[in-house]
Amino acid sequence: MFASAAEIAKAVREGKVSALEVTNAALERIEATDHRLRAFRHVDAEGARAAASELDTARRTGVSLGTLAGVPIAVKENVPVDGLPREVGSLVRRGERSDSDALAVGRLRSAHGVVIGMTCMPEYGHIGLGHSPLGPATRNPWSMAHTPGGSSSGSAAAVASGQAALALGTDGGGSIRIPSACCGVVGHKPTLGRVPHAPLRAGFSPMSHLGPIGRSVGDVAMMLDVIAGQDHRDPASLPSEGVCYAELSQESRSDGRIAWAPQLGTATVDDDVLQVCLSAIEALEANGYTVVEIDPFLDDWTDAWAILFDVMMASLVVERLSDVYRLSEPSLIARVEHGLGVKAIEIAEAEATRRDVWASFNRLYEHFDVIVTPALLAPPLPVDPQTGEIDNPEAWSDRWFMHMYPANLTGQPACSVPVGTTVDSLPVGLQVMGSRFADGRVITFASAVERCVNWLGTRPEIA
């Protein structure tokens, strides 16, 4: 189950393998590994096999299959999938099921992808870790003693371990990029509006994005081609960029100006992480790219992000507050209480900071094609071997994933690409950011990073 999504789809379209065979292989992989990983909240074996069988019948009758023909796809459990659980990692929502597909899921199905199940996330996606009150914590395929990150925890773990070829995640503060960096896979947070949110849910925030996770930039680009595009049900959705992301991911250009920011803000990057990222930067320079180290002066954005994110969290649960106080984790309750207590003037000030950060980045993009940073400030965090949790998780946010916040505040695209491992064999991601609307440029440069570091084909031990 480590063939690329592109290879799987091509083989299914050409009849070299059936969609049902691919689906069964994915389900067997889940059965063999998920008792350890806990990537999936719900596996829809029956529905996946039925969908795969329909594709095989259609192909035999002459129907031309789509871009994602037979590709096994995992979906984060906060994204609606018709008939499947949508419990968002919370006891408050236990037993709830969706009665329709999200637009992005419908587009995946229309491209003949096969949804195999719902992946685990921390409660309401409030933290970048892999545990929730609903069950055992999701583990990192590279090391069961370390977090897979979050909040698209199960999605990244499933892709890294070969349980799925692609996954759909969400990102309000790094929730696609954090677990992708931790699990050694590619995660792309598109420009705000590139992938529509439809139907719009309560608590929707302009910091929240839908996006793809895959084992290569090419696979992520192929999925983005399918799920991107304007829809009238999301007023923030964008028209097509007018490019084919999959084609851009195959470009072999070796020119361009890259701004290298080893540190954004005040937090310090772990030496081991920094050395791995520096090796990637040197590889880019050796391949002809112009790399300029920058030390951008940016207004502190962490407080602004926390205000806007916690207001979003509060709006998600405001109609269920009594249940939240009774059933939810203290770390979620703390966020909700903060969000409920935020004053209107504080929101206005946070929005002003958002504009200032946006302007600061835009000035940089006048001189550079992309900005690259270490995705995370430290390697995947160690967890309790029994619970999969870490001590004092709230204290880690600024020290660990501070580099995630700016792209959510500004709506600019950002992609985490694996570039190597630490001395302890834990994955390290490099974040590639581009100006708003420039997803194609980010995909192009992310692919360049991938080629320069020769990561493709690297697998965790659980593989």
Language-model-detected regions and their locations in the chain:
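Structural helix-boundary/capping segments
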Residues: 32, 110, 160-266, 278-287, ...
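Short glycine/serine-rich loop/turn segments
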Residues: 68-210, 263, 375-393
